């Protein structure tokens, strides 16, 4: 129910959120109960996420990445700046494009491209034109992701079950995923729910130091509290 609710709400706010439906399941004619069917995060003909397809003429490509516990898939796994410089212990996997397009050269390009973004985010001039983080990352997407996950106390966000994607000609955007532990369903009690958590996680650690990002998030939160996140909604 948490995933169903928040995926649908995110779909009204963000450029992309996974499609989700309740469905009744029958197996060999025997009723199994009510389940939640969820779209996996990927780009394809029948997917809601539409990224520019790879081209055989260049190794540059659109891509989607997942930060999570290790998948064990050596073909999809990459090492980025945050892992070897910031001691980020989670694994980064490529979820798009598929293995058909993942040549060693293209995989290396994706790893380098995302590492360049992380390096710029952790540089001393990360909030100064022309090197500012917002030149590479979509402000609205990163603020909405922060607000939705903090609002629901979804403490997996930003270090587990975390997805980020980028069209080859676009900016980085976040995608919500996995609210199983949200809304007071965490594995241990939340002692101080009035405190923020996402600000300590890898990319948001630096974003939270930027006054412009904080002000944009405050403005966005106030707007959402008048609508989709209001007490009456």
What function would you assign to each model-found segment?
Residues 1-233:
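Phosphate/dinucleotide-binding and metal-coordinating scaffold of catalytic cores
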């Amino acid at each position: 129910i948490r995933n169903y609710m928040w995926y649908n709400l995110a779909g009204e706010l963000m450029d992309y959120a996974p499609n989700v439906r309740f469905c009744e399941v029958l197996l060999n004619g025997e009723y199994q109960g009510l389940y939640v069917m969820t779209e996996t995060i990927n780009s394809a003909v029948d997917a809601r996420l539409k990224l520019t397809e790879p081209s055989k003429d260049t190794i540059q490509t659109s891509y989607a990445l997942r930060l999570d516990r290790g998948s064990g898939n050596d073909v999809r796994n990459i090492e980025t700046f945050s892992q070897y410089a910031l001691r980020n212990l989670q694994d980064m996997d490529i979820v798009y494009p598929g293995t058909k397009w993942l040549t060693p050269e293209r995989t290396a390009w994706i790893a380098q491209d995302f590492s360049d973004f992380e390096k710029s985010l952790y540089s001393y001039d990360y909030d100064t034109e022309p090197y500012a983080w917002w030149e590479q990352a979509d402000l609205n997407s990163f603020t909405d992701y922060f607000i939705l996950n903090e609002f629901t106390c979804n403490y997996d966000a930003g270090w587990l079950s975390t997805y980020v994607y980028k069209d080859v000609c676009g900016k980085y955007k976040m995608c919500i995923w996995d609210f199983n532990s949200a809304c007071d369903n965490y594995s241990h009690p939340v002692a101080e729910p009035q405190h923020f958590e996402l600000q300590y996680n890898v990319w948001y650690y630096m974003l939270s130091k930027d006054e412009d990002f904080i002000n944009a998030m405050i403005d966005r939160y106030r707007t959402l509290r008048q609508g989709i996140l209001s007490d009456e909604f």
